[in-house]
């Protein structure tokens, strides 16, 4: 834990405007996986991982950082606008090869093939990979709204939920019954 605290202190000392915290995922096909598999590296126990996370958040808060999203903290005014749009169920347009978008109720990606991308641009058509288009039922979209909204420290607004899905409060009474 001392090494972790020292690392967080060094990060805070550098005063970046934004800090992201992610737990290491040991995945097959990576160098870390090989080290782990060969017994040359240990995985951090889940309880210790959570302690490290909460310790870092406390240290960052003390240094003036605001924990605004499950894995991000920022100095006031430096929150990631893209992340907040995503977690707030706002539309966004991805530009470039393989970029993701959410617009008009659909989720889609641009082609990641340069030739197809350039051809589409020259022909003035969207460079969307047609196989990537995802349209969900309203019930599924409601679940996505809740799930992504819960990534934010403030959670999500039922008023915003009602507005997005044009639902009256009676339709969301089930959601409210699950509040702590």
Language-model region placement:
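Single conserved hydrophobic/aromatic residue that forms the stacking wall/gate
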Residues: 170-180
